[in-house]
């Protein structure tokens, strides 16, 4: 079965405190949904090289055992509560993708 992934790119972070509040709620929701954070750059000391229209501000990659599990985690009550913590006008490019078998 192909794995599922959350891919998030944050073009700019205007309110770091609210993003931290979101993270405190989102982390447990992701874990409860079976997700594993593979990358949280650059905040965990990793490196990012952005090419073309790429933005190096913040990139998050979360792995799930299946695409369906990734969708269910996003739709979960716990994660929806985390989304409410994001600042007004917050911008991110978020998608759920299915990996190759």
Regions found by a protein language model. Name each.
Residues 1-58, 64-71, 75, 98-101:
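Short S/T/G/P-rich N-terminal loop/turn motif that feeds into the first structured element of a domain
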Residues 70-91:
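C-terminal structural segments of small proteins and small subunits
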Residues 87-101:
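C-terminal end-helix/capping segment
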Residues 36-39, 82-83, 92-95:
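A short linear hydrophobic-aromatic micro-motif
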């Amino acid at each position: 079965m192909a794995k599922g992934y959350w891919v998030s790119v944050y073009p700019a972070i205007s309110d770091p405190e609210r993003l931290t509040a979101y993270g405190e709620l989102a982390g447990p929701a992701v874990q409860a949904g079976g997700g594993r954070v593979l990358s949280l750059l650059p905040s965990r000391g990793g490196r990012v090289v952005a090419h073309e229209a790429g933005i190096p501000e913040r990139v998050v990659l979360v792995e799930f055992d299946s695409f369906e599990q990734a969708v269910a985690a996003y739709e979960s009550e716990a994660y929806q509560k985390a989304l409410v913590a994001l600042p007004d006008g917050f911008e991110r490019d978020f998608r759920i993708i299915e990996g190759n078998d």
